[in-house]
Amino acid sequence: MNNLIDMRQFAKSAGTNIIVKAGNEVFHRGDNGACMYIVQSGTIEMVIGETVIETVGPNEAIGFMSMIDTQPRSSTARVKEDSELSVIDQRTFRFMVDEVPNFALYIMGVLARRIRGMSAVMSE
């Protein structure tokens, strides 16, 4: 993804970093969302049921919609290959929105791409 900023370095220092092995889920559709994740390395599939809506990789955010609207997770994040993720809590997310240049544009870009991806899947 061609982002305005590379969030990995900031997220790695601002968040808690975890390793998730292939085949595991980061979160499940319907879960309450208290954090978001920035993918440092690896690949995550965003799925609804068994339909892959999107595949995300390094420098991409997942789980951020729950930071914006406090609604449950809208999809399941399934790890396709071993991944390192930076966990960003609500407080850090708000700080990033307020203080990190271009972060809001970064999130809007991810949202736009996700909407386009879902539209493409639905039209198939």
Task: Label each residue range with its predicted role.
Residues 1-124:
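Cytosolic regulatory regions built on CNB/CRP/Popeye-like sensor folds
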